[in-house]
């Protein structure tokens, strides 16, 4: 709203693609993405209730947990700081060029290409972006908690491994059921 005087309530954001949700020009979208990933904005985001408690519980139980985001590579430092401030310092963070936005080669250990991501193995994932569902399909038999958001409510799930969850309690319950069945 501050940038373009466009007011779309959160519950009405129908698409993960904010350019489409807010009907922005390419130039406006670029400006929005730049502003949204400024360190001061990233550091101001509120935590989703239950997230850090649940993730830390999994780490305490001995599960290997990674946070993988499609944020731009240059947002790593403020994202890492935010995680640390929310007691997630034990969880590695990786920025993956999921959306083909990166135009420069960045040789940092915390940035990865899709090919590098696909070489990893995951049993459980949490995703809210329908455009990223295709990436999760690369992991055989990976259970996917789809965090319920306005922009994914109309999305069709690729298969039965994708389960909609309304909050972190439901995500944790799904994880515990899945971990109990495969462990």
Residue ranges of predicted features:
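Substrate-recognition "cap/lid" segment bordering the active-site pocket of phosphatases
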Residues: 73-126, 130-137
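Short, charged, surface-exposed secondary-structure boundary motifs
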Residues: 101-106, 153-160, 174
């Amino acid at each position: 709203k501050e940038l373009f005087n466009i007011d779309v309530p959160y519950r009405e954001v129908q698409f993960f693609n904010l350019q489409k949700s807010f009907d922005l020009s390419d130039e406006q979208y670029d400006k929005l993405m730049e502003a949204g990933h400024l360190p001061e904005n990233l550091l101001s985001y509120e935590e989703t209730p239950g997230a850090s408690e649940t993730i830390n519980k999994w780490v305490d139980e001995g599960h290997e947990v990674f946070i993988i985001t499609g944020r731009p590579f240059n947002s790593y430092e403020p994202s890492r700081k935010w995680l640390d401030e929310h007691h997630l310092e034990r969880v590695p963070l990786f920025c993956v060029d999921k959306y083909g936005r990166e135009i420069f080669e960045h040789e940092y250990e915390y940035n990865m290409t899709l090919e590098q991501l696909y070489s990893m193995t995951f049993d459980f994932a949490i995703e809210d972006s329908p455009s990223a569902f295709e990436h999760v399909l690369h992991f055989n038999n990976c259970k996917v908690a789809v965090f319920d958001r306005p922009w994914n409510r109309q999305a069709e799930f690729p298969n039965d491994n994708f389960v909609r969850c309304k909050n972190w309690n439901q995500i944790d319950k799904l994880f515990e059921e899945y971990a109990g069945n495969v462990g």
